[in-house]
Structures are given as structure tokens and as C-alpha cells.
């Protein structure tokens, strides 16, 4: 499943389809944008499958639930994936979150949650003013503090692993994100010793394997 059409999320699609005949699942707006970017016509209609927010889709033994997100894309979504009573949630590229977001992430066992930037690094950095405003807007990305606050609201007895994801290369770094989120957990919930594994997803490597 594809969350939205920005290049850092779809640049490998053509290769996956060409080499492995991979089906592509995304919302209608995202599929339209993908087709427009497919200049070589590699992706045929037979590879494209439309999904809709809040409507579950079965992919083999996995039930996939798309949920709408606030981001500057055509029709962006996050996903939850449920199989054998266990739930994994992917919530990145969120300009903001609300009760709707929290409701979709509740009772998750594994959570990939955006911790995109440190606000001070972003504001002092080299990005153009317009791009900074976009990132900080409700259609941009969650800061480290936002990520920690959202995590506080979705912690549950089932949660075993939380991965901080989609870190900016220019406006964040792993240890800063990790410490900022832990600080938020302490300030909002008084949590010092965590009952779940908190780690940072690496940019250029697969995340560690987890078994539920």
C-alpha cells in the first residue's frame, strides 16, 4: 500500500512492478498522481488497485485499513495492518493528528510514528522560508514533540514496539528524536521506564525484525 505520491514514497514503484509484477494499492487521488508521473508507461492498469479511507481491504491473511491524513498530497492516507489478532500501524507524513487519527491507532502492537524534525533546527536551518512554513503547517510533518504527544495518546497494553520514523536528514538526528520523545512521555505521562521497545527507524536500512 502507498500512502501518497511524493517522490520519496513512490520512486521505487516502477522497478518493483517491472521486476516483481507487484500490485500497487493506493487511494484514487494517489493512483491518478502516480499515473501522471509514470512517463514510461511501465505501470499498467492491471497493477493498480484503489483503496478508500475507512474501508478495510483483505490482502491475503492481512486486513489493511487506510485512514485519512493531513498532508499536502492528492489523497494521503496512513495504514493499519491486522493479522492473527495483532495490529501494526503506520502513521507518517502527518501535518497534524486528531481524535480520528488516535482512534485508528488505538490497540496497536507495533507503531511506526513520524518524528520528522526538531523545530529549532528547522527554523535555524537553510531551508527556504516557504518550505519551513509548509513543514510546520497542518499539512506538513510532525515534530519530535508532536510525535511524543501522539504516542502518549495511543500507548496501550498491547503496544510492544514503537519506531520513530521519517526523520529529516537536515533538521533532525536519531538521538535527538529519541530523547525528545522520551522527554515528552515523561512530561505528559510520567513514564520513565517503558513497557515497550522505543527505537528510531534507520533511513537507509531495514528496521529490525520483530516477532509478535
List the model feature ranges, each with a label.
Residues 48-52, 200-201:
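Short acidic-hydrophobic, aromatic-tinged amphipathic segments that line or gate anion-handling sites
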Residues 99-200:
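Cap/insert and terminal regions of metallo-dependent hydrolase folds
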Residues 5, 29, 69-72, 92-94, ...:
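Active-site metal-binding loops of divalent metal-dependent hydrolases
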Residues 1-29:
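Active-site metal-binding motif and surrounding structural segment of the metallo-beta-lactamase
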Residues 11, 50-110, 209-212:
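Core dinuclear metal-dependent hydrolase active-site scaffold
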Residues 19-24, 87-88, 196-197:
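Short active-site oxyanion
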Residues 196-212:
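Short, basic/aromatic-enriched C-terminal tail that caps enzymatic domains
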Residues 11-20, 35-38, 172-179:
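Metal-dependent catalytic neighborhoods of phosphoester/phosphodiester hydrolases
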